[in-house]
A protein has these predicted regions:
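Glycine- and aromatic-enriched mobile tails/lids
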Residues: 3-9, 25, 39-41, 47-48, ...
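N-terminal Rossmann-like FAD-binding beta1-loop-alpha1 element of flavoenzymes
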Residues: 10-34
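Conserved N-terminal glycine-rich FAD pyrophosphate-binding loop of Rossmann-like flavoproteins
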Residues: 38-71, 75, 243, 254-258
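Rossmann-like flavin
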Residues: 73-113
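Short beta-strand to alpha-helix junction loop
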Residues: 78-91, 124-142, 153, 215-223, ...
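Conserved redox-cofactor binding core of oxidoreductases
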Residues: 98-192, 197, 204, 248-251
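FAD-site-proximal beta/loop scaffold in flavoenzymes
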Residues: 160-172, 177, 181-190, 339-383
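An anion/pyrophosphate-binding glycine-rich loop and adjacent beta-alpha core
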Residues: 228, 234-341, 346, 398, ...
Length: 531
């Protein structure tokens, strides 16, 4: 078949805040391909309810306070240079978002209406109602569509990045100077894999929470960029730090899970087990108001000990009208499932929410592979360390997009397209039975990760996950070599790679720190604190 070869100065894989803001910042100097595996509205950015953290109210707040809050949340293993960079550059990037048409809520006096979230010492979260992410995403989409130099490829799915490996050179983890020449991208309309050649490639593919059964993320979050870079022998770091939201609505069959906000516990919600007993007093003096990771661990422990798959959140003691006024969306959603939250307990369970680790990058957003940058949730800048401070993620994406854009523009002229890249080998077919097996394997990955590499870990559980994933890996690689590339098989392959990375890096961290908690090493180790 006649396969397409497309050439762009910049190839951006992923279309959330990270990918789109990078594209907008470089498009005046060259052509940009924006690869988007679903529609532009399916990005994780769109679903970010909370807001975006930035010091704006200098009367009470300052950079030092925001830096300190971030370091404390990260359990002291954040990279101080990354923390300082994001926080000190945040205000100028907020201005850029406003220039692109983002509306942040203001008070009557014209100042920003700021929220305060767990772990922040001051009010510093800019927001747009309770759907900040959607406001940012839709504003960026408008800007991107208007820009003549940006071409959006919707329903195109990146399969592999192209390196010297594809020129027949042996590449290992120790090869110096691995270079990225573009990517092989599946056109879902034609079913063919096209070759995209670029001078600069950017990974902005988001997180990998869909490897867990319970997740608050859209199901496109399969860790594609992280897996592609890992297979190309790039460096991936801190994958053991997965943030779980303690209270997602438990309704089997609902994927992704509906988020029951923190604010509900602040409002006076009480956690109970299925025998209606309160249990937080066993775990923390702050009860239901303890920090996210403590509450998530307590719920997890309660469920595992009792062999149950959820707990209850109870606001029935509060004034019904007050409850409806404060939480109209939650009230409506629960009512549609036959739960009246003013009279009934809300079934909740923790769900995978955010990945702190990812593709290791420097202060310019460069990965360990030359000509390849990584931005947003798929990258690991060192900002989050062992745990992310609320609302620090959207701001990290745009600050690093800005640095990466400046760096990429300064080196663009050094590079050319590599014309020697072979076409993708497009042989193979797939039967319906094999499709069913792929779906089944995905469910198995979800169950392995949920049961053995969840909130509370142990050596025994991690070894078990490792062995199970190994079997799935062998089966899937054999299938992948035989069949034609499809989004399903590629996503499965990526999920297995990412599950393996989370498991292996969890095994290597022989301590409990940040979001990584293991019963075999329940305390932080002294050595790491000094690093």
């Amino acid at each position: 078949p006649n396969l397409m070869i497309r050439k762009f100065d910049f190839l951006v894989i992923g279309s959330g805040i990270a990918g789109m803001s990078f594209a907008l910042k470089v498009a005046h100097k060259g052509s940009v391909a924006l690869i988007c595996k679903a529609g532009l509205e399916e990005a994780n950015t769109y679903y970010a309810q909370g807001g975006i953290a930035s010091v704006t109210n200098l009367k009470v707040d300052n950079f030092e306070k925001h830096i300190h809050d971030t370091m404390v949340a990260g359990d002291w293993i954040s990279d101080p240079a990354a923390v300082e960079k994001v926080i000190c550059n945040a205000p100028s990037q907020i201005e850029e978002l406003i220039k692109w048409g983002v509306n942040f809520d203001k008070k009557d006096n014209g100042e920003f209406d700021l929220h305060k979230e767990g772990g922040h010492s001051e009010f510093r979260i800019l927001h747009h109602k309770d759907n900040t992410g959607a406001e940012i995403q839709t504003s960026l989409i408008e800007e991107v569509k208007r820009h003549p130099n940006i071409t959006v490829f919707s329903n195109f799915y990146a399969v592999e990045i192209i390196t010297q490996h594809h020129l027949g050179i042996i590449v290992t983890r120790h090869t110096p100077g691995i270079k990225c020449f573009g990517a092989y991208v599946l056109n879902e309309k034609t079913g063919e894999v096209d070759t995209f050649l670029s001078k600069i490639t950017v990974m902005a593919t988001g997180g990998c929470e869909a490897v867990y059964t319970h997740t608050t993320n859209p199901l496109v979050a399969t860790g594609d960029g992280i897996a592609m870079v890992y297979r190309a022998k790039g460096v991936v770091k801190d994958m053991e730090f997965i943030q779980f939201h303690p209270t997602a609505l438990y309704h089997p069959g609902d994927r992704p899970s509906f988020l029951i906000t923190e604010a509900m516990r602040g409002y006076g919600g009480v956690l109970r087990n299925l025998s209606s007993e309160e249990f937080m007093q066993k775990y923390d003096p702050r009860l239901s108001l303890a920090p996210r990771d403590i509450v998530a661990r307590a719920i997890d422990n309660e469920m595992k000990q009792r062999g149950e798959d959820h707990v209850y959140l109870d606001v029935t003691h509060k004034d019904p009208e007050e409850t409806k006024k404060h939480f109209p969306n939650i009230y409506k959603k629960c009512l549609s499932l036959g739960i009246d939250i003013t009279k009934d307990y809300i079934p909740v369970a923790p769900a995978a929410h955010y990945l702190c680790g990812g593709i290791k990058v420097d202060l310019d957003g460069q990965s360990s592979i030359k000509r390849l940058y990584a931005l947003g949730e798929c990258s690991c800048t060192g900002l989050h360390g062992g745990n992310r401070l609320a609302s620090n993620s959207l701001i990290e994406a745009i600050v690093y997009a800005d640095s990466a854009a400046k760096h990429a523009l300064s080196v663009l002229d050094r590079y050319d397209f590599n014309e020697d890249i072979p076409e993708w080998n497009a042989e193979g077919t797939i039967s319906n039975e094999e499709r069913i097996l792929i779906t089944q394997s995905m469910k198995e990955v979800n169950q392995i990760m949920e049961s053995y590499v969840g909130i509370v870990r142990s050596n025994l559980r991690l070894v078990r996950a490792w062995n199970r994933l190994d079997i799935l890996y062998e089966e899937t690689e054999r299938l992948f070599k035989r069949v034609k590339a499809s989004r399903e098989i590629c996503e499965l392959r990526n999920m297995i790679n990412v599950g393996y990375l989370i498991t292996r890096q969890a095994m290597e961290r022989k301590e409990s720190r940040g979001l990584h908690y293991t019963i075999d090493y329940p305390h932080p180790s002294k050595d790491n604190a000094e690093k």
